[in-house]
Amino acid sequence: MDLFHRAQEPVNRELTWIKPFDNRMDEILRLKEKSETCPKEMKKVFLTAWAELASQVKLHQKVASGIVKSGLPLSVYYNVTLKTDMSSGTIDFLIISDELIVVVLFKTKEHIEWDRYDTRFAKLPEMKEVIAAEETACMLADWLSVNRALSSKELARVVPVLIDEDQDELSASAHPIERSEVFTGISKALEVKPDVFEKWLLENCEVSEFPVFIGQRLRKITDAVDQAVI
């Protein structure tokens, strides 16, 4: 008799999109149409919004493709906004694997008006996305803990990942998951290039012999997430 066999574990597990990926083509087309029909003085505004959304979705497609190609039995939410008793925030991809809950956000290009920015008397603006990723992961971890879907000792299983085009191919390599220096309990944010996200998943979210987040535990997590979705 296998003393370690978990009866509740399904024999065949597969990728499940709880909130499916959406290429947001309707939004993109609406912005494009508005740029063609709007008053001349508004054209640049709509063209910029259209270009930025199209570029953003292209990056999201790379990550969605990596999730599918990995072949891992993941549970995934795409572009989900959560509001809890403590805070609110949008998660681009929320991925639940056998042992980790991955909060994926995308690094944005910061627009700096250099002609109005005098570097002689001020520091360069600091990128805030790493802290924002950890803050969002902390919000989720706290909410899951309040709803008894995670114990206080399991908060470090919530891992924030920041997708950054400027990272190199080595960003997919498995790194030791360290504790956040700012937020209690959760893991430190990792920065990963979108092109190698599939490899990152395979190295960090592999199928576990003794999975934690399956069956009833997985349902408790998804129930808690669903309660917070707006």
Q: What is each of the regions a protein language model found here?
A:
Residues M1-G89, I96-V102, E110-I230:
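Surface-exposed interaction regions that form or flank ligand-binding interfaces
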